[in-house]
Regions:
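N-terminal nucleophile
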Residues: 1-260
Length: 260
């Protein structure tokens, strides 16, 4: 298994992962952090070290400028990789966390990689923290059990519903092209409904959490995902937990690389 999640509110952000080398800081002084998809096969520790050495961001830059700078760095880097590597990295996500100058609320954005007709692309950062008080919950990797526990549905069940919807519409319309247009609209509606049902209750609860509460919940969710995914009932330990706050910047409270 490979699962990671970001939990964030006005107090700060908490990241947790069951894999090493998935949560990174830019520097001790700048509260800017990066969490990568734990399924990615790229050497992220080397990538982040190279980014720190070659690029320069500052506290005066807006958060989205920092995220965009990292996205541009990744774009330039992956151009140098072979096609098989780029193909394997398709549909992976990178989350950036930080602060705007003179702002007390944290922000987060997500960068997604994709294979399109034009080739490999790294999409522009999309802010995911524009709700009141920066409340956010973002999952990366294999988090199907977490989604179900939090009141949503698994991707597998969701896909079966969409396929059934498409097949029935095709039978009624009798035209595949028309049915596809209706399917696309139906998918949009289903995704919005899922998002509303899954997020509303959970995000409302997260908005009241302290940093300590978020650390406990994030770690418990990651370890529960490991337990439910394991064939021998052995809990997959949480390897990394990182916290980003305005007062303390980025802090590791658990990092197996350092024996914590």
């Amino acid at each position: 298994m490979a699962a990671a999640l970001l939990m964030m509110n006005m107090h700060g952000a908490v990241m947790a992962s069951d894999c090493d080398r998935t949560i990174f800081r830019y520097s001790e002084k700048i509260p800017f952090a990066i969490m990568v998809d734990p399924r990615s096969e790229l050497p992220w520790e080397d990538i982040i070290m190279d980014y720190q050495a070659k690029r320069s961001i500052s506290n005066e830059m807006s958060f989205m400028d920092c995220a965009t700078d990292f996205r541009q760095y990744l774009t330039d880097l992956l151009k140098l990789k072979d096609s098989n590597t780029r193909k394997n990295e398709s549909d992976k996500q990178v989350v950036c966390i930080g602060y705007d100058p003179n702002s007390i609320f944290p922000k987060a954005s997500i960068i997604t990689t994709a294979i399109t007709e034009r080739g490999f692309m790294i999409n522009r950062p999309i802010e995911i923290s524009n709700l009141p008080k920066s409340v956010c919950l973002q999952m990366l990797g294999n988090c199907e059990n977490i989604r179900i526990l939090l009141g949503g549905m698994s991707d597998d069940i969701s896909q079966k519903i969409k396929d059934l919807f498409f097949n029935k519409i095709s039978d009624i319309v009798g035209n595949k092209d028309s049915a596809k247009l209706i399917k696309d609209f139906g998918n949009y509606i289903l995704e919005k409904l899922e998002s509303i049902q899954e997020d509303t209750k959970v995000l409302e609860a997260i908005s009241f959490f302290t940093i300590k509460d978020m650390v406990k919940m994030a770690e418990n969710l990651i370890e529960t995902e490991g337990l439910l995914n394991s064939n021998n009932s052995a809990i997959s330990p949480t390897h990394e937990i990182g916290i980003v706050t305005l007062a303390e910047g980025f802090v590791y409270i658990k990092h197996s690389l350092y024996g914590a």
